Amino acid sequence: MSLWGKSKKNMQGLVGLFIFYLALGYQINSMRKVSILGLMSIFSLSILFHLLVIIGIVPSHIVWGGRATNADELMQLEIVSISLNTLFLVFILILNGNIKVRIKPLLAKILLWLMSILFILNTIGNLLAKSSIEKIIFTPVTLLSSVFCLYLALRFLYSKG
């Protein structure tokens, strides 16, 4: 059975990560918290996923629209993806106060808008992918990421709720 045939185990992993974040003290009591927690989870899981692609556990044909032509190109794309997801995760941790770095509100808002646009474009790319797995699994993930970033861009800097 393939990795994707074990959707129940994948779902259990997502639930486990969600419980892990709750155990760390994140309480979901507002849309802001849902957005922050959702983005932290998505970026963390995305980093893990792309590491699994690099080491060969996840088949490479289900990423990058199935268009990576060779191992070198795939590695470059995966490194870019891991780097961007790490930067996004650090940025969200800064916004949430987990990392004590001051960031100007205007810069934060611009970055959130850019992330929203990037995830919308990525959603379109996923819809055009050759792989049905990429369409079915990653289209909702990138769409949700864009919604969370858009919400934070519109509301996060004006209130804490």
Give the predicted meaning of each segment.
Residues S35-F49, T142-V147:
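Alpha-helical transmembrane segments of integral membrane proteins, especially early/N-terminal helices
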Residues K6-N10:
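Polybasic, lysine-rich low-complexity intrinsically disordered segments
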Residues S145-G161:
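Membrane-water interface at the C-terminal end of transmembrane alpha helices
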Residues N29-R32, I36, I54-I79, V101:
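Interfacial loop at the N-terminal end of multi-pass membrane proteins
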Residues T123-F138, L157:
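Membrane-helix boundary connector in multi-pass membrane proteins
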Residues L45, L52-I54, A71-G97, W113-I117:
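Core segments of alpha-helical transmembrane spans in multipass integral membrane proteins
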Residues W64-D72, P105, S131-T142:
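Non-cytosolic membrane-interface motifs at loop->transmembrane helix junctions
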Residues A108-G125:
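Hydrophobic alpha-helical membrane segments
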